[in-house]
Amino acid sequence: MAKQVVLVCKRVWYYSSTDEDMFFEWISRIKCIATYDGVRDELYLYINTKRVSNENLRELLALFYRYKIDMKQLQIFLNKNNNQWFYDNKKAYWHRRVFGVNKV
């Protein structure tokens, strides 16, 4: 059985009704999102961790960045197979939002 992770999207801001439609279209195309539901101002994305490929993780990064969703929760997907591009790439647009600032 695949492990499931729940990502929380709090108070997602849509700029128009079409923007909201596109958000839900986008999440429907990310293969690792098994399902979603919501309560009040929170949307829960149920992630099948066995399906989190590099491509799917990049889509989650872009989605969370675009809609200003807390990206720190994406740290859970760091592993030896994606470490080089996901963590070691300190200049990537997502790095600070996912991993914070490293103080040397």
Please provide the spans of the model-predicted regions:
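Helix-rich interaction surfaces within compact, conserved domain-sized segments
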Residues: 49-104
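Short acidic amphipathic segments
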Residues: 27-39
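Conserved strand-to-helix beginnings and helix N-cap segments that scaffold or border functional pockets
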Residues: 17-21, 54-57
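Short, surface-exposed ligand-recognition loops at beta-strand->loop->(often short) alpha-helix junctions
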Residues: 9-19
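Residue-level "edge-of-site" marker
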Residues: 40-41, 77
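Short N-terminal edge-element motif at the start of the domain
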Residues: 1-2
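Histidine-anchored nucleotide/phosphate-binding helix
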Residues: 23-25
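A generic structural motif
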Residues: 41-51
